[in-house]
Amino acid sequence: MSTTSTTPQTAPRRATITDVAREAGTGKTSISRYLNGEMSVLSPDLRARIEAAIARLDYQPNQMARGLKRGRNRLIGMLLADLTNPYTVEVLQGVEAACHALGLMPLICHAANEVEMERRYLQLLTTYRVEGVIVNALGVREETLRPVVGSGIPAVLVDRLVDGLVADMVGLDNRAAAELGTRHLLESGFDEIWFAVQPFEQVSSRQLREAAFREAMGAQAGQAGQAGQVGQGGKGRARGHTLVLNLADTAEVERSLAELDRAIDAATNAGHSGRGGNLANPGGAARPAAPHSRRIALFAANAPVALCLALHLKARYGADWQSRVALLSIDDPDWAELTGVTTIRQPTYEIGYRAVEFLHERIEGVQTAARDCLLPGELIVRASTSR
């Protein structure tokens, strides 16, 4: 019977600036000057010895310590509400590219749509002495950001304004995007349009989209009334509704979707004889809309809402659910192209890149009034709304 004994292995000690100085036969001051690029004060022979010592010892400078000594660490914080949202991931790609180009290092904080977690992360970022903060959060308020901006740390907001906070903001032109989508649905001849949005009381981007939808619907109603016009087939002006989908509460989602189901059935089954009410086809295929039914469309305020609607409609009406109801979404997730859903594509990469550029300018001391950079969305028309 043999036994083996193991001795805990200790990781090799990292070389320090003192080790490099000893190896190069000089003092720590000369090493610091070399690391800081002050080559003019070092002789060619000394520079060569220091370079060789660094290579032999595999010395890696402590960038955080060096940055703190200079008062700069090139670290910026980014507070994100929902990293599972494709929009956030795409914005983050632009952030990372800009950070790489500008020599910054992003510290990502994912709050998972929890307001208390957002507050804690903001407090934590101040202890890391970040040079700036980019905020795309759910419930951040001015008093939450006050410790950050009050300590002289610049902040840039992504897509969402914060009441009472004067700061740069980069994002989609939400009003224009919602108007663009609503006009497309109206011009496509839909008689009934439901704008589906998550709770919007505390999120400015959702507020702007919902308000723009209502205003666009009201404007077409006024224009049609003044001109004495009616919709296609003499059915009258299009009707608009707002449906709140609280994706964080399953019971509330079910109640909201039940309301939507009743509206879809009432609109699309109007011309069918026989039983009314819920006519979802148990065989897995949607019954086509009746010849004299009202054409109904759903306008999702973002990709998570659109996905919730699409999955529900497929489960209820079958794979051919789009023969019964159209779907348009702000955001253009990959699955939208596969299913033929019309979207309004956001310039997500540009939003992230521009946010870092704004923040970098503030870090470097640019003093201007707060800036809003509103970027246009692009309407991508697919089969869902062109049938």
Predicted regions and their residues:
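Amphipathic helical "hinge" segments at domain boundaries
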Residues: 44-48, 57-132, 199, 211-214
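Short, solvent-exposed amphipathic alpha-helices that sit
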Residues: 49, 87-101, 177-181, 204-222, ...
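Flexible loop/hinge segments that line or gate small-molecule binding clefts
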Residues: 113, 136-180, 200, 304, ...
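Hydrophobic alpha-helical segments within soluble ligand-binding/sensing domains
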Residues: 170-195, 252-263, 346-364
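Flexible loop/turn connectors
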Residues: 265, 270-387
